[in-house]
Amino acid sequence: MTFRNCVAVDLGASSGRVMLARYERECRSLTLREIHRFNNGLHSQNGYVTWDVDSLESAIRLGLNKVCEEGIRIDSIGIDTWGVDFVLLDQQGQRVGLPVAYRDSRTNGLMAQAQQQLGKRDIYQRSGIQFLPFNTIYQLRALTEQQPELIPHIAHALLMADYFSYRLTGEMNWEYTNATTTQLVNINSDDWDESLLAWSGANKAWFGRPTHPGNVIGHWICPQGNEIPVVAVASHDTASAVIASPLSGSRAAYLSSGTWSLMGFESQTPFTNDTALAANITNEGGAEGRYRVLKNIMGLWLLQRVLQERQINDLPALIAATQALPACRFTINPNDDRFINPDEMCSEIQAACRETAQPIPESDAELARCIFDSLALLYADVLHELAQLRGEDFSQLHIVGGGCQNALLNQLCADACGIRVIAGPVEASTLGNIGIQLMTLDELNNVDDFRQVVSTTANLTTFTPNPDSEIAHYVAQIHSTRQTKELCA
């Protein structure tokens, strides 16, 4: 039997994990084992919301060392993280300034300023990326305007995954899938757009040309002295999650469900027409030259904050209590900017309901019900937008990532969207990370080949839409009201 041992470092906004994958070539089987799991979260430092990158690096090294201590010879390592955030380095590779998080308020007003000065359509035609107030382009503009004293010291800007790969190898890389989240990469050249960079205030010399997934960045020397290749995987965690989504055929959509919900489909060509711009659709880079045509949805961040504020530790019990409540009594727009990082999420949700003359969710279960129903309704709207954009309906939706363990939300999604939902795999980002490593090691041919492996090894659960459910009736009522308004317009 021929085995490969690959390690995936998967960093999310709320937690991180070091996972060991064992791939058996002859039977094409893939098993995952969690080596080390650790918390991640926002910190307050010198008036900024930041990440503790030193703690994250220590946790990564601890996990890698644990694998080596077991006597396992690692064939390769890959790192994926969330998008848009970056670390600045000087000529000696030392950090400049703080690793500020995307939920910091320093970018307030800058997106509107960019649209006014550069033109919204021109920015979109250049980048193909949706307008989000925390995109890297606005973070860099905030930095150069608010902290100009740092500029002379900056030699390099590395996105998070590239920074941690640099810390392991001493080599710098700018991986393409994550680079596209910055709104600074030109969609036609796959290189940094000089006009957008100029507006951000950043120097093009801070960046190297983006590399597509699959190159070896450098080597990590383990405690035993072995040189282990560190592979540039699809380092945006959503890009990795999509690679591991067992999509079958062109009518399959995906929903990567976690702190953020990202819903979309794969395409060989980007969508940058006026319809896509009006819907704020993004065309993020994927593996093998594919585009991830998708839309960001605020996701389970709202629930995470409610759990934290209400000190709720038993999530299954909360979901069970939530399931007993009537649907759609309280609904909000999860994508409202007010929910990006409010002082108190519970109060913000209640205020949104109060302002729209709805009942006020008071109990833990009512708040959770509000979040789940609102997400499912937004999923239905976004799926409809995506289908209209490409001119073809979807036949199934693959929900992957940690959020796919929420059976109630999966069923609500199926009912609201009127589509078959297939949930799993849970560790999609980790698996996609491993998939690129196995391709780099010449164990697999391509993404479609890897998806066949995932389909046969992952635990997948199907949810069939119930047209008689409360939320399905609610959606039908909304659509009927919309059609009436359109006829009367």
Curated annotation (Swiss-Prot):
Its EC number is 2.7.1.5. ATP binds at A13, S14, S15, G16, R17, T259, Q304, G402. One of its GO terms (cellular component) is cytosol. Substrate binds at G83, H236, D237, T238, N296. Its cofactor is Mg(2+). Involved in the catabolism of L-rhamnose (6-deoxy-L-mannose). Catalyzes the transfer of the gamma-phosphate group from ATP to the 1-hydroxyl group of L-rhamnulose to yield L-rhamnulose 1-phosphate. Monomer. This is Rhamnulokinase. It comes from Escherichia coli O17:K52:H18 (strain UMN026 / ExPEC). The gene is rhaB.
